A protein has these predicted regions:
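N-terminal charged helix/coil linker that caps or initiates catalytic domains
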Residues: 1-26
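Conserved N-terminal Rossmann-fold NAD(P)-binding element of oxidoreductases
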Residues: 27-29, 52
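Hydrophobic/small residue at the entry helix of a nucleotide-binding pocket
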Residues: 33-34
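Conserved S-adenosyl-L-methionine
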Residues: 42-48, 136
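Glycine-rich phosphate-binding loop and adjoining beta1-alpha1-beta2 segment
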Residues: 46, 51-89
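Conserved acidic residues
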Residues: 98-100
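Short amphipathic alpha-helix with an adjacent loop that forms part of the alpha/beta core around
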Residues: 104-114
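E1/E1-like adenylate-forming module used to activate ubiquitin-like modifiers
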Residues: 116-117, 121-202
Length: 202
């Protein structure tokens, strides 16, 4: 009998789909990057999520965030994302953490229970803490670099942090990884130069 994951099973096989169903992924930051990550994972059949974000949907998020609509403005991002996941897969297990992840509260999270960690937060200190905690727990992690004011999707690449260029955030992360003796880190970054920022919306 066909279900919402039949095409995924046809593409990757039943064994792979079973692994996805058992997978537990933590996504830190449910915004322009993290929201699309969670959506794709849910549609792929990942069965268990931890969602971490303290923000609410703002009207200015509508141009780029998958959870943002006029109906969701003002609602907690993690709650909106939970509803979207369940509308795709009612059997998904979801734990919400309506908080900002900081080095000060990292001990509240048990990274060892995750199969994969996605860092989609903006704060450098938080990004570093997420990566270090995942590495310490032996859990695979991918970190998103700067995407603000960039419009060319063809310029995005998946690479090791030490092979990145142009991106200022990646430069800061490279320095931090060297300082903490982290030899490799998978990241998504763009070689595109950012567009000029608009100082004020009118």
């Amino acid at each position: 009998m066909l279900n919402q994951f039949s095409r995924t099973e046809l593409l990757f096989g039943s064994e792979a789909l079973a692994k996805l169903k058992k997978a537990h992924v933590a996504v830190f930051g449910i915004g322009g990057v993290g929201g699309h990550v969670v959506e794709a994972l849910a549609r792929s059949g990942v069965g268990s999520f931890d969602l971490i974000d303290n923000d609410t949907v703002a009207i200015t998020n509508i141009n780029r965030q998958i959870i943002a609509t006029l109906d969701t403005v003002g609602q907690p991002k993690v709650e909106v994302m939970r509803k979207r996941i369940l509308s795709i897969n009612p059997e998904a297990e979801i734990t919400l953490h309506q908080c900002f992840f900081l080095p000060e509260n990292k001990d509240e999270f048990d990274f060892s229970k995750y199969d994969y960690v996605v860092d989609a937060v903006d704060t450098v200190a938080a990004k570093i803490a997420i990566v270090l905690a995942a590495k310490e727990a032996g859990v695979p992690v991918i970190s998103s670099m700067g995407a603000g004011n960039k419009v060319n999707p063809a310029m995005f690449e998946v690479a090791d942090i030490y092979k990145t260029s142009i991106d200022p955030l990646a430069r800061v992360m490279r320095q931090a990884m060297k300082k903490h003796h982290i030899k490799k880190l998978k990241v998504v970054y763009s070689k595109e130069l950012p567009l000029l920022q608009v100082d004020e919306l009118k």
